[in-house]
Amino acid sequence: ILIQGESGTQRRTLARAIHNFSRRHHYPFSVLHSPGSDLTEASLLRLLAETNHGTLVLSQVDRFPLSIQDLLVNVLTNVHGNFFSAPETRRFDVRIIAIADDNLYKKVEKGTFLRELFHLLSASELQTVPLRRRREDIPDLLNYFLLQFFHNTDMTCDRIFSEGLLRFLKEYAYPGNIHELYNLSC
């Protein structure tokens, strides 16, 4: 699964929800943040083994160095085979969710992202939408944040925020997306 969208659009929350509402929810949920070029095949295999039957999120995959992308292609295309660092056959059953800020297809065209890895990751694609393009969700998000702040109360944003303030919040640009709305609501 490939999840693309701007920073702050809750891509990792979406990845967690996919995991939590799947048959894999009892198994590990691991995140590999943009690694340096020193990630080894053995380290990646160890992470796959630890996450077996669960979900591995490749966070900011669009920033992975080409050497790591090549390593991922090798590991993902040999999920049921032999590896250089492990002579015995190892079998992994791991859902891979890749998260990217940028349009990966454009990076493929520029030569900064491996075409083969793009095709391996993009069997299913999801695009998160920035808050400025879904302003109608702002009252619901504010209500959700209020529930987080005031557990077990019947407070809603229309009881706390004036109509003028809600109108202002709906018109604001939100360059920080949902994170910025969350911080404003605190």
Which functions belong to the PLM regions below?
Residues 20-21, 74-78:
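Post-Walker A connector loop of ABC transporter nucleotide-binding domains
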